[in-house]
Amino acid sequence: GGLKFHFLSQKGYTGLANVSNKYDNYKVVPSIEGRFFKERFGVFIQANLEKRILTSNTFSASYNNKSDDASTYVTNSVSLSHLPRVKDRVNAAIVLDYRLSNGKIRFSNFGNSGITEVTNRSESFNIGGNSHFYSMGYSKSNLNMITNTLSFENQFSKAHMNFKFSHSYSESESPNNWSLNFYRLPAGLNDFYNQANIDPSSVIDAALINSSETNLNGVSSNNSFTPERKYMTSMDLKIPVNLGIKISAEIKFGGKYRTSKRSHRIESFGTTGTFQSPSERGAALMVIEYLGKPVNFWSPDIPLNWFIDSTFTYGDFLDGKYEMHYPLDFHMIEDLIFFCQDTIDAFASEGSTGAYARNNYWSTTNNYSGDEILNAAYIMATINVGQKLTIIPGIRYQGFQTSYKGVRGQQSPISFYNYDHTDTTITVDRPFWLPNLNVRYKPFKWFDIRMAYSNTISYPDFNTIIPRIDATTSAYVRWNNYNLNPSQSENLDLYFTFYENKIGLLTIGGFKKEITDLIYPWRFSAPGLAAIPYYLTDRLPAEHLNYTIETYINNHLVVDNYGLEIDWQTHFWYLPKPFNGLVLNMNYTHVQSEAHYPYVYAGATSATNVDTSFTDRLIYQPNHIFNFSMGYDYKGFSILVSMLYQDDVFSGVSQWQQLRSTTAEYKRWDIALKQDLPWLGLQLYSNFNNINNAKDKSVLQMYPDIPKSVEDYGMTAQIGLRLKI
């Protein structure tokens, strides 16, 4: 009984080299709880105020194949970005419960309000366009969420019932995201055009660097709103069944019904061409006048060197491997964006409509709305045969209906002002029966065997099934495959568990998965009228063009996935002092997988089609995962050193072997410490994360020294104080 008060206060540090607000991380968590009215009524109230600095430095590059050469790559573009990212968040929780004579009523409420601000300074190099861009972008996303759950649990004469009803609502709003870029043309990159095996760092080193010859290209902004609401109700019943002296059973059955409604709309504005275009001269001169610079009708260039922030430095960007130049002044760029937004009508009256106007294509093409309905029911039994054998058979029905409206359109040279499109709504039902069986045999107190057969499904991300089609002017079609089936996995598991005072808990086991309808991103070609199934329904594709289709597909072949897992948790209490405080946790998983990715490259006729199918690992599946932690406990002090290792992961599918990508192997070390203090239940703690500065990295599979992406967050640390009264 009585009230209990907990309080946590934490400060944090971000170790990335070029972060200016390294010590601005904090977290404060007060909570109070108690029981009243003879312990029947309980209250729990908690708040969480948090600020996190999540700045990162990134590298990315895009590659292509050189004609029909299957062994060399061509570098298309390279990009470097410095991304200061600040996330402010406030969470609140109120949980009320009332104990009945044979059950409990519980009412839970959780709320979250967060703001994420990102400033993006970037440089990009386009080899085909022989151009070098400097960009600055800003985004502010307001995310609000609330979840309410009412549950009723009660034991009737023989049946136990659990009823639950929940509601959740979330909305993400970006009131004014913007970006602006300068460019230099030519940029000294012609020598790399369509050349084989060019290291992307060579492109960066060769680019011509001169801020006075790099001029304003374009500005853009957008505002968006994305709401989502869900309702869910469920009920479960348990009934004991007596089947004899040595056999007891419990039957459990129930169901769930959930509805979801979501939508997205965006309004986008920007420059249709470039501020250096003669048609936008009027707008360029207005900008020059606003900036207080001399106006010359014959020289409307707006050079980058007017906007350089001399107080900002990129520091040791990605360990000094790449260099970024000329950081743009945030306040000057923001001021210019606001000027363009306020002067949109004046630009048009000067004949410079394309300098800044509503972009009808981007304001339309990604909008959507939709509903989802999930209904499920199950029945299962827990059968105990004596003290050693437990059998749990069951079957589950799950139906899932999606109904989404998306945009289908044809791009054209005037799509900026008038996008040719239609809205399409498609409804799809996906019913499944999912049987399962679990068996546990415990021949000894210190050993048991667990076997399981199960069927699981993984639904495609809703963004991939919205019936959107985006046909470009260059025979490239982005086609959302609304007929995607969920991936299904038939699973077999066998695990042996040992538990003994000195051994601790040791589990050794294996698993086998047969995956059908594996979902993965894909591009393929379709000549002329063969592209009809992927093209706009109100017109035909051009017969003389060979279309490239970008989409997600199901693999119609079965993917086999095998694995071995070892988990050991122990405390060396039996060793002599001071070693008796050591604790150890280890987990190793080895996975062997093979997937066949079918692909036919379309020729001019079916007779000239080329089968370029290939076999590789299961996408997004590492071969080796190893988690290790070693700790030491002594009275109120503890320290834990942990390591996470993950082997490279097959992450990019392509019919061209040299364009397939994998993540680089990842290894991260962390340290956690805590010390109980002798006053008021105080505890001091600290965490040091990623102390070896591991980076997220993907590379070309055939050329593991050639990066496709790199993301560096640096080391982080927290120190805090907990109070329990």
Segments (PLM) and residue ranges:
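C-terminal beta-signal and adjacent terminal beta-strands/loops
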Residues: 271, 275, 645-653, 673-725
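Gram-negative outer-membrane beta-barrel transporters
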Residues: 512-514, 531-650
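Transmembrane beta-strands of outer-membrane beta-barrel pores
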Residues: 3-9, 49-53, 100, 111-115, ...
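Surface-exposed extracellular loop regions of Gram-negative outer-membrane beta-barrel proteins
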Residues: 117, 122, 261, 365, ...
